[in-house]
């Protein structure tokens, strides 16, 4: 087979996926190394723009942990994580919103626009997109009893109004969403970006939810597991084989598929064009989470 024929075959491999996902919505959580390394930033932006021009509707929800950590450190503020959630006081909340909505969001918008897309940056506070309430984390104490931990100004989404996203999509724009929301009382709350992505995927009845990470996917005993069912995940969390920042990722995937999102994926954002590999190739990449 000559080189040109090989290229054509690679393009044709994508055909059934293009037919399947044409006009559909895919929510992508963008974070980790893919937001730091220049090559990965460029390849991610290219993936998003290409998907839009192919007739697929990508919605990007982003994190920004490294940028937040850097500014918190320079301001001599303390930071703590519990099961992947940042404990957030008022000073930290100011930093979080400034970095996520004021800086990182606009950087992503600029990058995607540079690649030929029409991105629009917003946060969960804009257009009443996401309403949240304070999140009290339930954990098991040493005596086996359940207890709740106050994480400060950390929220959990109670409702999502997708109208602003749907309006942007109809006009050909790509929504880029910062994970900051507001309570009914007007209090600004920090939302875990994975959790925000899952809630938005549910509200949009997305076909796919994709979370970019700095691991090959879900690792159990150091080995990549390419397919997991709900019952497996609960067991792995209980035994500690899934822990730390991976817990909110798998929990948001489970919530999404429970609410009608067809497929949820945790993939390696360190691989250039990982989003296209997952959506448009037979092999895919990372871990698939499904019902069962």
Swiss-Prot record:
Main enzyme class: transferase
One GO cellular component term noted in the UniProt record for this chain: cytoplasm
Subcellular location(s) of the protein: Cytoplasm
Residues where substrate binds: 64-65, 86, 190
SUPFAM superfamilies tied to this protein: Carbamate kinase-like
GO biological process: arginine biosynthetic process via ornithine; L-arginine biosynthetic process
Catalysed reaction equations from the record: N-acetyl-L-glutamate + ATP = N-acetyl-L-glutamyl 5-phosphate + ADP
Pfam families (alphabetical): AA_kinase (PF00696)
Family matches, as CDD domains: AAK_NAGK-C
Superkingdom, taxonomy of origin: Bacteria
Signal peptide limits: none
Keyword check for Amino-acid biosynthesis: yes
GO MF annotations in UniProt: acetylglutamate kinase activity; ATP binding
Keyword Transferase set for record: yes
Enzyme Commission (EC) number: 2.7.2.8
Pathway: Amino-acid biosynthesis; L-arginine biosynthesis; N(2)-acetyl-L-ornithine from L-glutamate: step 2/4
Site (Transition state stabilizer): 29, 249
Keywords assigned: Amino-acid biosynthesis, Arginine biosynthesis, ATP-binding, Cytoplasm, Kinase, Nucleotide-binding, Transferase
Family: Belongs to the acetylglutamate kinase family. ArgB subfamily.
Protein's job: Catalyzes the ATP-dependent phosphorylation of N-acetyl-L-glutamate.
Name of the molecule in the record: Acetylglutamate kinase
Organism of this sequence: Leptospira biflexa serovar Patoc (strain Patoc 1 / Ames)
